[in-house]
């Protein structure tokens, strides 16, 4: 079975200097089937990513059953698969100021080559959920070494509360001027009526030049060097009838380099039928960084 769905948006964006029109439309192909023994399988990709879907760069393919779910392609890393990101602000996500994305190392947030498919396994039994993900450590379908990523995560849900722990690691090839990286994540998610709260704390080591790029600093590139870092954040959103209001704040602190605080606030109004009015503002405390904002209409088909 093949189904078509999609989304679209139109509105205005403020980039810190000027207002610009902004619009987008996308079509999603979703394919699914079931074997005689009851195994479910399928795939999905966006129309504009059809070329990348042929090589696993974009889109995903899955097989699921009583053993869990196996997914390959542009899949999430284990931690993100269980914990997700902070509340998304604005109809364009406003991620050019840091955004709501938790700084995971692996999966579709990965620092490895974009044409390197990820394998993700997830399994749930009662209140427990586990996930594991990895790449094959090669560039595309070649024998050229690439960074090898691995991640594991587990979560426990009791009532309206979820707590979880994740670990991610990237092993760089010997020929690369990039240090090995790793990160441990703690996450907590809660629901109080119509209000959702999510918090996380992450601690580990980043490649020095990757860390410097976050602050628009010139790479050193003299040798592969790791620096300690930590990150933490909180988001809250609440729904009142057709209106949802939410925001986030998160901090990235890198030893010997700098620290930055990202924050955003937004609201949406559900018009019904798959349409909504959405707007938001976002900023950070980096030098020469101005507030960005957007306001527009989003559609789901």
From Swiss-Prot:
Its main location: membrane. It is found in: Cell outer membrane. It comes from the Bacteria. Pfam families: Porin_4 (PF13609). Keywords: Cell outer membrane, Ion transport, Membrane, Porin, Transmembrane, Transmembrane beta strand, Transport. One of its GO terms (biological process) is monoatomic ion transport. InterPro entries: Gram_neg_porin_domain, Porin_dom_sf. GO terms for cellular component: cell outer membrane; pore complex. GO terms for molecular function: porin activity. Signal peptide: none annotated. The keyword Membrane applies. It is a multi-pass membrane protein. The keyword Ion transport applies. The monomer consists of a 16-stranded antiparallel beta-pleated sheet barrel (171 residues), three short alpha-helices (18 residues) and 13 hydrogen-bonded reverse turns (26 residues). Homotrimer. Forms channels that allow the passive diffusion of small hydrophilic solutes up to an exclusion limit of about 0.6 kDa. This is Porin. It comes from Rhodobacter capsulatus.
